[in-house]
């Protein structure tokens, strides 16, 4: 089945990473193009939903294009899984002072504050996910985390129960550790720090980030 295929591919990715045989190929490209591709493909697969792209900045970055697209697909797939049919899912590309921020927003059930710091763990599925019929093995966000951290980036999440979730991928414009067009092993996982706000903001949203 498609679910089993996805599980096998995810486990192979993690196995190659753990054995330090997973390579990144750094190339320069427009981050907007990757987001637009994910938007178009998602619209074809799930025509009942609306996929918007806003903000839509054109930002030249240096990264592994395939892996960055994989991150966006993981975030988009999750948004589709946990949102009501007919929802609007918004992808974003924004140029920042220090680089580029990619985002994915949904109107799903939201993630409880106490679970935000665990969603990037392997095989972890939050309580709201376990109560739905959505498929998933709890590996997607851990893979996204590995890829983002391998690019010296940061992965953030902002969520409110009943209002939806937004993921942010903050990336530098260049990768100092490898020359353009070169290959490099995806770095091994470090003991990442999960930072969770002790209080929700005025709008009731809680945030967490891994760095």
Question: Predicted segment positions?
Answer:
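Short conserved segment of the HATPase_c
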Residues: 111-123
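Short helix-loop "hinge" at the ATP-lid/N-box region of the Bergerat-fold HATPase_c
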Residues: 79-80
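Detector for a conserved hydrophobic position within an alpha-helical segment of the HATPase_c
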Residues: 147-148
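Conserved glycine-rich
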Residues: 152-153
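A conserved beta-strand-to-alpha-helix junction within the catalytic ATP-binding
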Residues: 25-40
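Conserved catalytic submotifs in the C-terminal HATPase_c
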Residues: 25-28, 48-60
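Acidic ATP/Mg2+-coordinating residue in the GHKL
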Residues: 106
């Amino acid at each position: 089945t498609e679910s089993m295929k996805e599980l096998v591919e995810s486990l192979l990715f993690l196995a190659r990473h753990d054995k330090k045989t997973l390579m990144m190929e750094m190339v320069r490209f427009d981050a907007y193009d990757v987001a637009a591709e994910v938007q178009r493909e998602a619209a074809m697969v799930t025509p009942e939903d609306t996929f918007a792209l806003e903000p839509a900045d054109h930002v030249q970055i240096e990264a592994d294009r395939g892996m960055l697209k994989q991150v966006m697909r993981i975030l988009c797939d999750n948004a589709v899984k946990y949102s009501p049919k007919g929802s609007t899912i918004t992808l974003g590309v924004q140029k920042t002072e220090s680089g580029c921020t990619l985002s994915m927003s949904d109107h799903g059930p939201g993630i409880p504050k106490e679970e935000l710091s665990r969603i990037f763990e392997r095989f972890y599925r939050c309580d709201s996910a376990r109560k739905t019929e959505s498929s998933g093995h709890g590996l997607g966000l851990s893979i996204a985390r590995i890829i983002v951290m391998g690019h010296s980036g940061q992965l953030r999440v902002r969520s409110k129960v009943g209002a939806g979730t937004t993921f942010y991928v903050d990336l530098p414009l260049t990768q100092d550790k490898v020359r353009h067009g070169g290959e490099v092993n995806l770095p091994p996982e470090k003991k990442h720090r999960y930072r969770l706000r002790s209080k929700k903001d005025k709008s009731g949203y809680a945030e967490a980030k891994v760095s």
